[in-house]
Amino acid sequence: MSVHRDAIRAARSLVVKVGTNALTTSSGVFDSSRLARLVDAIEARMKAGTDVVIVSSGAIAAGIEPLGLSLRPKDLATKQAAASVGQVALVNSWSAAFARYGRAVGQVLLTAQDISMRVQHTNAQRTLDRLRALHAVAIVNENDTVATNEIRFGDNDRLSAVVAHLVGAEALVLLSDINGLYDSDPRKNTGARFVPEVTGSADLDGVVASRGSSLGTGGMVSKMSSALLAADAGVPVLLAAAADAATALTDASVGTVFAARPDRMSARRFWLRYAADSVGSLTLDEGAVWAVVQQRRSLLAAGITAVSGRFYGGDVVELRGPDATMVARGVVAYDATELAAMMGRSTSELPCELRRPAVHADDLVSI
């Protein structure tokens, strides 16, 4: 077994993401017995001493039948109505399944806005940490009943990657209806090549991923990008079929493993790079791009050539090169109006109170 699979097998804290297709029948009906079998596999891992946080899809699918709908709704209002009904059934099913083992569950509903705002981000982290300390199983889902298109994660694959870093998980396991990554859809192409490990971009050469199913939103494109996000932040990922959950959670010998970068990204840098909303941008000259990206130095006003957006000191902004390509994100020290007057001027030309870096190196992350 590879060292990357060993890392997942030995992890003492996991985030397990369960996709909609793992909880529904072939006809799209929510199936609580499938969920119960997944809980059996998860409980075995927990009994061995591993902390587990679950990110569960399926709320909208679980609400389809009770509302008399024949297909997954397409309009936002009906999706949210289905989610509000289905979330009750979903959490009750998780609760009943874990109650067989004497475990309580806690529901945590998040929106992208909860993660993008630093205070809410920290509060979510504390809640999840406290649930684990109290030996309750956190069941996390996107809050579909209030999330709009503008403040959505988009799917629970990305949410699971964010949660994995949020709780300091040592590994992320994505359980779906397919047994790993292929270079094309194996359901449509019998000659599709299985990819057992992803340790670099070369392993993804020729991979053509599919979009989501009719019941869920996260297709292979989503799973692959979310796995790469988590791995880039230092969290190894296993993508496997829900039918193989027991094996995946026991020894990680199935599915596709995504190797993590050796140095785990700090919580603040992860938030800056992947979770925080940016509210403006600064355009840099080539010298400033080199200093920020290659030398990891603070951004000074002298290297700024343009200021865009309405922002204030403490907001997150994008840093863009002369060709408009984003090269970094960071917390800006000044308001947009102040920077517009300061840009292009050397530190010695500025009043003493404006000689701090525009964006300090400690508040920067390269893209």
Curated annotation (Swiss-Prot):
Pathway(s) this gene product operates in, as recorded in its UniProt entry: Amino-acid biosynthesis; L-proline biosynthesis; L-glutamate 5-semialdehyde from L-glutamate: step 1/2
Q: Where is the PUA domain?
A: 279-357
Q: Which GO terms describe its biological process?
A: L-proline biosynthetic process
Per UniProt, the keywords (alphabetical) are: Amino-acid biosynthesis, ATP-binding, Cytoplasm, Kinase, Nucleotide-binding, Proline biosynthesis, Transferase
The transmembrane segments are none
Q: Which InterPro entries match?
A: AceGlu_kinase-like_sf (IPR036393), Asp/Glu/Uridylate_kinase (IPR001048), G5K_ProB (IPR041739), Glu/AcGlu_kinase (IPR001057), Glu_5kinase (IPR011529), Glu_5kinase/COase_Synthase (IPR005715), Glutamate_5-kinase_CS (IPR019797), PUA (IPR002478)
What PROSITE patterns does this protein map onto? Answer: GLUTAMATE_5_KINASE (PS00902), PUA (PS50890)
Q: Name one GO molecular function term.
A: ATP binding
- GO cellular component assignments: cytosol
Query: Which SMART domains does the UniProt record give?
Result: PUA
What does the record give as EC number? 2.7.2.11
The entry's localization annotation reads: Cytoplasm
Chain residues that bind ATP? 17, 176-177, 217-223
Reaction equation(s) it catalyzes:
L-glutamate + ATP = L-glutamyl 5-phosphate + ADP
Write down the Pfam families for this protein, in alphabetical order: AA_kinase, PUA
Which residues bind substrate per the record?
57, 144, 156
Function comment? Catalyzes the transfer of a phosphate group to glutamate to form L-glutamate 5-phosphate.
Q: Which family does it belong to?
A: Belongs to the glutamate 5-kinase family.
Query: Which protein are we looking at?
Result: Glutamate 5-kinase
Q: Which organism is it from?
A: Mycobacterium leprae (strain TN)
Gene that encodes the chain:
proB
